[in-house]
């Protein structure tokens, strides 16, 4: 079974982008409330 590089990258981006977005919002919220 070959690993589809494009599919792997797409999946990684699909997971990492929303995670990074939420992390940035979380950091901004914490720094604001501090």
UniProtKB/Swiss-Prot annotation:
GO biological process, one term: photosynthesis, light reaction
Keywords assigned by UniProt, alphabetized: Chloroplast, Membrane, Photosynthesis, Photosystem II, Plastid, Reaction center, Thylakoid, Transmembrane, Transmembrane helix
One GO location term (cellular component): chloroplast thylakoid membrane
Subcellular location: Plastid, Chloroplast thylakoid membrane
Domain of life: Eukaryota
Chief subcellular location: plastid
Positions of transmembrane segments: 5-25
Topology in the lipid bilayer: Single-pass membrane protein
SUPFAM superfamilies for this protein: Photosystem II reaction center protein M, PsbM
Disulfide bonds: none
Pfam families referenced in this protein's UniProt entry, alphabetically: PsbM (PF05151)
Keyword Nucleus found: no
NCBIfam families the record matches: PS_II_psbM
Subunit details: PSII is composed of 1 copy each of membrane proteins PsbA, PsbB, PsbC, PsbD, PsbE, PsbF, PsbH, PsbI, PsbJ, PsbK, PsbL, PsbM, PsbT, PsbX, PsbY, PsbZ, Psb30/Ycf12, at least 3 peripheral proteins of the oxygen-evolving complex and a large number of cofactors. It forms dimeric complexes.
Role according to the record: One of the components of the core complex of photosystem II (PSII). PSII is a light-driven water:plastoquinone oxidoreductase that uses light energy to abstract electrons from H(2)O, generating O(2) and a proton gradient subsequently used for ATP formation. It consists of a core antenna complex that captures photons, and an electron transfer chain that converts photonic excitation into a charge separation. This subunit is found at the monomer-monomer interface.
Family the UniProt entry places it in: Belongs to the PsbM family.
UniProt name for this protein: Photosystem II reaction center protein M
Gene: psbM
